[in-house]
């Protein structure tokens, strides 16, 4: 079974975390996880630039260290880089000390105090430890673009069906992501419905 939105219990447990923009307007935020990737990120940046959209990138620390030129390009285009950990750890099976250390190791490659837990998996003691230094950001819609077996048509269908005011959308600028096949179509669909993609700094305080 696939879950396109976080479980409601997560919103109750992580009460100070962000899952959605609080707004009555037709505003959206695009976020991208697990990059940068030389085969995906440059094309993604071109698409965002064409549509004058600024986005939030939660970069894998190892990839950020490996591709500093891509990190610099993301920042130069006016996007924001959040912390996604250095080693993409699963919080459910990682000790508090190891998890916090991994987040700290990724900090030099970020440009904000925003953090998204890899896989969305975060134990409460980890959350409690991190929230003093970071604003934890989850998402409102995840269309499984990272899973090629799901397919780009299904990803686009999910986005169209689940889209609502204030949606924070998580996509992936990785080698296996299908986002290149549907992102432009999704942007055109959203703007055609009167939605605007807003700058991350207009949503988050950090």
Question: What is each model feature region?
Answer:
Residues 24, 79-86, 135-140:
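Short, basic/glycine-rich phosphate-binding loops at helix/coil junctions
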Residues 49, 75, 130-131, 191:
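Anion (oxyanion) recognition and catalysis
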Residues 50-76:
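A short, conserved beta-to-alpha structural element at the edge of catalytic cores
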Residues 121, 127-160, 195-206:
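His/Asp/Glu-enriched short active-site or ligand-binding loop at hydrolase and phosphoryl-transfer sites
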Residues 159-201:
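Catalytic grooves of carbohydrate-active enzymes
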């Amino acid at each position: 079974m696939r879950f396109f939105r976080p479980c409601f219990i997560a919103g109750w447990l992580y009460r100070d975390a962000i899952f959605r923009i609080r707004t009555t307007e037709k505003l959206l935020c695009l976020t991208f996880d697990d990059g940068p990737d030389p085969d995906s990120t440059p094309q993604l940046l071109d698409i965002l630039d064409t549509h004058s959209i600024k986005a939030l990138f939660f970069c894998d620390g190892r990839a950020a260290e490996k591709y500093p030129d891509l990190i610099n390009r993301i920042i130069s285009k006016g996007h924001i880089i959040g912390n996604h950990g250095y080693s993409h750890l699963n919080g459910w099976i990682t000790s508090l000390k190891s998890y916090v250390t991994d987040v700290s190791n990724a900090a030099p490659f970020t440009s904000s105090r925003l953090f998204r837990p890899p896989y969305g998996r975060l134990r409460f003691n980890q959350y409690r430890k991190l929230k003093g230094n970071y604003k934890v950001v989850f998402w409102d819609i995840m269309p499984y673009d990272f899973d090629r077996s799901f397919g780009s048509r299904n990803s686009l269908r999910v986005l169209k069906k689940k889209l609502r005011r204030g949606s924070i959308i998580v996509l992936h600028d990785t080698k296996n992501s299908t986002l290149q096949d549907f992102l432009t179509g999704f942007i055109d669909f959203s703007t055609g419905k009167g939605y605007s993609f807003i700058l991350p700094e207009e949503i988050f305080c950090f």
